[in-house]
């Protein structure tokens, strides 16, 4: 089979906490691509079962029976240390552990998987979805991230793309992508707010759009607030109610928790459209008295009360974003709702309260981010003209200086790409080296901000304190990823660093993960081929047994025996888990013998036809006078030859008078 040709398309991928989506520019318009399961979004879930890796819907289907090996909402762990994810660990049934570097990783049967590897599995699924639609190999993508993702999380997302076999041309914030999708065909200048409440994160961005220019004025958010947290309040309510009713604590039962998670998500979605919903989970557990069933009614009002503190947490970031943009709520022309949680009526009511206007519901909150990513892909690929995207960094970047102080070099909401330089010096006489500690955050003291990297500038010539001139340069690319350099003016000595993800993936580790991903891809392909061959063999057995049953009396006994023997050979090959080649060979042999049934039936039909023809020619004589008394036309007998009908004409009709 010939390999697919390489596509020149840059696809857009929304790598979401709960669901992911892929889009591509086609004929100048963005198109969301449906998955092989027929859905326009794919659950961001990866599961390990029986040596197989399942992604998307197949992974979600088996989550209830395999909770410890089903990894969902892994985006909340990407680019983060184990010490930073304590609250997230409590909400998932799988095991999260620290690796040797203190990074948060997933422990599945003693094998550790990084969040980048799991993200790569989801990205591969998106890549394959696009390739199946385009009929071409896709190698380039624009991937979206929450606007409030820090440098480490952005770098980790880019690494996940590389592991998936993608050249990530740009990382762009989700609200910015949504604004692109909304404003690409709009005329005139507008100031818009993008309120993005997704599965795991909350972002608010203020943009000014007009004449093809999309300028982000400010951004803010909460990377610990999303749909998972709303599910959590329903789960906790169900646990409390069940404990009151039955005296049983389900919180330690992972299988029951996974069922409650699914039920909570379903109830949450339903309550956006109805005022109450029934939650029924039969046989949720069992005790000495027998099985127990969970049956509860949750009203919209109850849910809004349970989630009120979560909804309240969206207000402060919105106020800060407006303040940073130097705008008031009345200056905003339109508010876009993005993310599945923005469908909740109480959330929409808060948006109206904050901005003083009804939010715009004209975009699909599940697809608009992927559409915007595809448009940005079109811009980078030259397919979309006259569009300029000016993004910002979400958090200030700086270094630690004397006294443990954070000295910012690049303030938050600075437009990127950008470069900033500042001169620093030594703190002691004859200091031979300085350690550059790179920080991200808004607090005045270094220890209260996030350290995202460090490096040493050595061999500084001896000099009194304060004399050496050390120029520190912060260079931020269009992806929001930071490169730092430090140069000693006297010696010309320079040291550079690209800020790696806090997950600490080195280049050799990334390359190994790329190789592993390719290996698993080939293994999965072989497993699918083996499964297809077994399924085909099973089908062949069924068809053969049916044919033998239906035609047992019409085919030779020795052929019946041969077919039954070959049926048994195929069945045995499947049972013994023989090689794909062996099963296929046995199946092909059975297929060959199945053809003999048709041959035997044809031979029998030919014999019957010959016998019928002989009877037609040598049968009893019919008096022609008698024939004339019938009012019908004669036709050749079945199986009769053409020559036997040469002299037969339509019979004349004779009217016979009725006796009086």
From Swiss-Prot:
Biased composition (Low complexity): 608-617
Induction annotation: By stress conditions e.g. heat shock.
Physiological role: Acts as a chaperone.
Further remark: Expressed early during infection.
Keyword Nucleotide-binding part of the UniProt annotation: yes
Name the record gives this protein: Chaperone protein DnaK
GO molecular function, one term: ATP-dependent protein folding chaperone
Assigned keywords, A-Z: ATP-binding, Chaperone, Nucleotide-binding, Phosphoprotein, Stress response
Database matches in Gene3D superfamilies: 1.20.1270.10, 3.30.420.40, Actin, Chain A, domain 4, Substrate Binding Domain Of DNAk, Chain A, domain 1
GO biological process assignments: chaperone cofactor-dependent protein refolding; protein refolding
Taxonomic lineage from the root: Bacteria, Pseudomonadati, Chlamydiota, Chlamydiia, Chlamydiales
HAMAP family, per database record: DnaK
Highest taxon of the lineage: Bacteria
Residue numbers of Phosphothreonine PTMs: 201
CDD domains assigned to the protein according to its UniProt record, in alphabetical order: ASKHA_NBD_HSP70_DnaK-like (cd10234)
Family affiliation: Belongs to the heat shock protein 70 family.
Region ranges (Disordered): 608-660
InterPro entries to which the protein is assigned, alphabetical: ATPase_NBD, Chaperone_DnaK, Heat_shock_70_CS, HSP70_C_sf, HSP70_peptide-bd_sf, Hsp_70_fam
């Amino acid at each position: 089979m010939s390999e697919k040709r390489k596509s020149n398309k840059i696809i857009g991928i929304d790598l979401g906490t709960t669901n992911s989506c892929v889009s591509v520019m086609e004929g100048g318009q963005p198109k969301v691509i449906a998955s092989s399961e027929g859905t326009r979004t794919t659950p961001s879930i990866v599961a390990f079962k029986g040596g197989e890796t399942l992604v998307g819907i197949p992974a979600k289907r088996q989550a209830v029976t395999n909770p410890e090996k089903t990894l969902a909402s892994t985006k909340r762990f990407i680019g983060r240390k184990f010490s930073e994810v304590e609250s997230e660990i409590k909400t998932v049934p799988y095991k999260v552990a620290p690796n040797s570097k203190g990074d948060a990783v997933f422990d599945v049967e003693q094998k550790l998987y990084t969040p980048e590897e799991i993200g790569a599995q989801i990205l591969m699924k998106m890549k394959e979805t696009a390739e199946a639609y385009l009929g071409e190999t896709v190698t380039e993508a624009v991937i979206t991230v929450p606007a409030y993702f820090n440098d480490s999380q952005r770098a980790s997302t880019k690494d996940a793309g590389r592991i998936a076999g993608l050249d990530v041309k740009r990382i762009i914030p989700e609200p910015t992508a949504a604004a692109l999708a909304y404003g690409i065909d709009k005329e005139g200048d507008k100031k818009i707010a993008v309120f993005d409440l997704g599965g795991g994160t909350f972002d608010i961005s203020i943009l000014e759009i007009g004449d093809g220019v999309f300028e982000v004025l400010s951004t803010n958010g909460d990377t610990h607030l999303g749909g998972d947290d709303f599910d959590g309040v329903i789960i906790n309510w169900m646990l409390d109610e069940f404990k009151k009713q039955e005296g049983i604590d389900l919180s330690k039962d992972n299988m029951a928790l996974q069922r409650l998670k699914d039920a909570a998500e379903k109830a949450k979605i339903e309550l956006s459209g109805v005022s109450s919903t029934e939650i029924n989970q039969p046989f949720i557990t069992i005790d000495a008295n027998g099985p127990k069933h969970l049956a509860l009614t949750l009203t919209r009002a109850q849910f809004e009360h349970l989630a009120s503190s979560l909804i309240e947490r969206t207000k402060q970031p919105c106020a800060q974003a407006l303040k940073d943009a130097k705008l008031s709520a009345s200056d905003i022309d339109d508010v876009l709702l993005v993310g599945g949680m923005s469908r909740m009526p109480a959330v929409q009511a808060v948006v109206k309260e904050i901005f003083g206007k009804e939010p715009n519901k004209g975009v699909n909150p599940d697809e608009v981010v992927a559409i915007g990513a595809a448009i940005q892909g079109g811009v980078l690929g030259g397919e979309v003209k006259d569009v300029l995207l000016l993004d910002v960094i979400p958090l200030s970047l700086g270094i630690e200086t004397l006294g443990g102080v954070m000295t910012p070099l690049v303030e938050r909401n600075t437009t990127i790409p950008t470069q900033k330089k500042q001169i620093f010096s030594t703190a002691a006489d004859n200091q031979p080296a300085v350690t550059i500690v790179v920080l991200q955050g808004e607090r005045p003291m270094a220890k209260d901000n996030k350290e995202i990297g460090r490096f040493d500038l050595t061999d500084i010539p001896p000099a009194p304190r304060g004399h050496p001139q050390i120029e520190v340069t912060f260079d931020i690319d269009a992806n929001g990823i930071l490169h730092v350099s430090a140069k000693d003016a006297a010696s010309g000595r320079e040291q550079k660093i690209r800020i790696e993800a806090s997950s600490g993936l080195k280049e050799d580790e990334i390359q190994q993960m790329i190789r592993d991903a390719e290996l698993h891809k080939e293994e999965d392909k072989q497993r699918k081929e083996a499964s297809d061959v077994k399924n085909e063999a099973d089908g062949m057995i069924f068809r053969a047994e049916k044919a033998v049953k239906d035609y047992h009396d019409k085919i030779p006994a020795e052929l019946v025996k041969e077919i039954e023997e070959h049926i048994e050979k195929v069945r045995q090959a499947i049972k013994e888990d023989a090689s794909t080649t062996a099963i296929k060979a046995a199946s092909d042999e059975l297929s060959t013998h199945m053809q003999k049934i048709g041959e035997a039936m044809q031979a029998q039909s030919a014999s019957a036809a010959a016998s019928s023809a002989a009877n037609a020619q040598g049968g009893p004589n019919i008096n022609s006078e008698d024939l004339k008394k019938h009012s019908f036309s004669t036709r050749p007998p079945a199986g009769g030859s053409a020559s036997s009908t040469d002299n037969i004409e339509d019979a004349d009709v004779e009217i016979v008078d009725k006796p009086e």
